[in-house]
Amino acid sequence: MAEELKPELWTTSSNSALKLSLVNDENAVQFSPIFTYPIFGQAEQLFGYQDLNILLAFDSVTFKPFLNIKYTKKLERGLDDVEGSILKFLPEGDVILKDEVEWVDAFNGEREKFALPNSESKVAEYTSGGESFAIFKVHLSDPNIRQLHRRMQIFTLLFIEAASYIDEDDSAWDIFMTFNTSTRQCIGYTTTYKHWRYINGQEFDSSEKTTKRAKISQFIIFPPYQSKSHGSHLYSAAIDVWSKEEKISEVTVEDPNEAFDDLRDRCDFMRLSGSGLSSSIPEDVPIPRTWLTEQARKYKLSLVQFTRLVEMILLYDNSPNFEIQVKARLYQKNHEVLTGMDSDTRKAKLQEAFTSLKEDYARILQKVPNRRRVLPSDEENAGESKRHKKE
């Protein structure tokens, strides 16, 4: 009885207790979630058990789910419903509980009928590590895709901050999925949404056609396949598709985290550099806003994102205009604050902001293929290790 009166003995971190697995023909790759608050609450704690171990496993091909919850002791009342909490976020009636043999038989049976999306939906292919991969643009109207997505969407809650399930009945959603073409394993996917874009009244009145904005919502590469360039290929495939769609006027990203910001910056930088943009950047400093706006529309990027990329290109090319361009933009952006300072303080603050941004650009560019040195050697480590807020 005394033991039951000590809450700390019955409280477990849900992040530590939950173990995820993707099972292939050879082994099971186990990893932990980053977040569990969407399932177990903001505190990410579970009460009422000792030595709690939650195994949530998926077949790496069909994503057929398996759940097994173990513990050495539990309270008779007042304990959290661990199983019920998890099952709310998985397809109803689809989860195999505790019986591993039944689960293996079930997903092996499903594998016999499992097929990749049809070839007409393939939008890109590539090789990595001696294996072949393909990216497909698919829709939830396909019952096979809908079932697969229902099973894997719980990963977005566990690895993406503030993620939520999408409305699978909304036809505006498209999904880009990457598959290993030999094993049929899904490597990762991104959910995307297209909606009507209103720019301003003048352009709306003068335009004969409506345009849409494409938005990347959720983007995930499953943990066993990360750090192998699959994310870059997936992002680039979606951008390539939208760049050819006349009705898409801009591509945006919904609440990106820092890692995705970096991936997007590198991919966009490579795309713009490969297009020959560098040779067309005006020598005027600061760069005219009219040119930036026109080119941002051409590449279907927001003005803020495009301006950042142009500045990265100037740094990459060691352009003497880089520092002047960045400082001019930072001064204009922070004009009201800076004008209230004396001259020496203003110069120091502007230099501090410039140095911080330059280091951040350099850190990103250091991971670009075939990169050149863009910072002196004594600054390179600082750029590699620090993450600065974007300006």
Swiss-Prot record:
Function of the molecule: Catalytic component of the histone acetylase B (HAT-B) complex. Acetylates 'Lys-12' of histone H4 which is required for telomeric silencing. Has intrinsic substrate specificity that modifies lysine in recognition sequence GXGKXG. Involved in DNA double-strand break repair.
Recorded superkingdom: Eukaryota
Quaternary structure annotation from Swiss-Prot or TrEMBL: Component of the HAT-B complex composed of at least HAT1 and HAT2. The HAT-B complex binds to histone H4 tail.
Annotated organism of origin: Eremothecium gossypii (strain ATCC 10895 / CBS 109.51 / FGSC 9923 / NRRL Y-1056) (Yeast)
Cell compartments where the protein resides: Cytoplasm; Nucleus
GO biological process: double-strand break repair; subtelomeric heterochromatin formation
Protein name from the UniProt record: Histone acetyltransferase type B catalytic subunit
Residue ranges of the region described as Disordered: 372-391
Chain positions covered by the region annotation Interaction with histone H4 N-terminus: 193-195
The UniProt record lists the keyword Disulfide bond: no
InterPro entries, alphabetized: Acyl_CoA_acyltransferase, Hat1_N, Hat1_N_sf, Hist_AcTrfase_B-typ_cat-su, Hist_AcTrfase_HAT1_C
Binding-site list for acetyl-CoA: 219-221, 226-232
EC number(s) recorded for this UniProt protein: 2.3.1.48
